[in-house]
């Protein structure tokens, strides 16, 4: 086990099993996406690429994958809050274009930024249970950015797009499969084994072609996401 980073409320563990890297995040709370979380996930992705692993699994803690951005960071001032948001959006682009196969092991609730991270992954498996997966932006009075809309449009089924992105409908894991948030839901005690099974299968595909074809089939979405990042950088 390699601990990527640890501050007061942040811990990301990097492990490699069967040449599959597992990035497991657990802050003991909501797995909020804040500056240290972003540092640690980026470091883990860098390490996975440097070690040339076959695939990467992103895993939350039991009961929650991630509850979204760290609201405490916004209380420190607009500039710090917007810097965190910009870095979070950079992470979404990196994940969605990541050259290695990327598997989400959704261990529980996946809300807001947590749900967007799940959507960036190539294969997404969730634990069954009384968990919420949703985009609450409308419900909490926030506007979606073009970057988020592009990602959501690419992943969420057309039949559910209005309910997901506009009406902030809350889905349980089984419902989230139909909506397009995730690909399959399994019993909690089977989640890690199933995520590893999928990761190993993807790792056996030709890596160069996997990376190239990922960029090709996601080119339009990534262009829209990067265009929005460029606009944000001008502000």
Model-derived regions, located:
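A short acidic, glycine-rich active-site loop
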Residues: 76-86
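Crotonase-fold acyl-CoA enzyme core
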Residues: 96-205
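Glycine-rich phosphate-binding loop at the start of an alpha helix
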Residues: 68, 82, 89, 112, ...
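A structural preference for short, pocket-lining loop segments at secondary-structure junctions
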Residues: 18-26, 37-78, 94-104, 123, ...
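Hydrophobic alpha-helical segments that mediate membrane insertion or helix-helix packing
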Residues: 23, 41, 58, 117-118, ...
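Histidine/acidic residue-rich metal-binding segments in metalloenzymes
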Residues: 34
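Short, active-site-adjacent cap segments at secondary-structure transitions
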Residues: 63-66, 110-112, 220
């Amino acid at each position: 086990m390699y601990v990527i980073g640890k501050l007061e409320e942040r811990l990301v563990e990097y492990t490699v099993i069967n040449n599959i890297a597992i990035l497991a995040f657990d802050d003991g709370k909501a797995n909020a996406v804040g500056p240290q979380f972003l540092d640690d996930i980026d470091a883990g992705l860098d390490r996975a690429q440097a070690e040339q692993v076959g695939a990467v699994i992103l895993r939350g803690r039991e009961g929650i994958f991630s509850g979204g951005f760290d609201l405490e960071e916004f209380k420190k001032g607009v500039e710090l809050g917007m810097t965190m948001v910009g870095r979070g959006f950079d992470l979404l682009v990196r994940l969605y274009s990541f050259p290695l196969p990327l598997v989400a092991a959704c261990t529980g609730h996946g809300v807001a930024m947590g749900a967007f991270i799940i959507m960036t992954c190539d294969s997404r498996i969730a634990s069954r249970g009384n968990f919420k997966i949703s985009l609450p932006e409308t419900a909490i009075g926030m506007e979606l950015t073009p970057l988020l809309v592009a990602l959501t449009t690419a992943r969420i089924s057309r039949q559910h797009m209005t309910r997901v992105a506009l009406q902030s409908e809350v889905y349980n894991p089984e419902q989230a499969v139909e909506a397009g948030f995730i690909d399959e839901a399994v019993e909690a005690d089977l989640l890690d084994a199933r995520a590893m099974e999928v990761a190993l299968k993807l790792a056996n595909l030709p890596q160069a072609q996997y990376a190239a074809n990922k960029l090709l089939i996601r080119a339009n979405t990534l262009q829209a996401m990067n265009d929005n990042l460029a606009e944000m950088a001008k502000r």
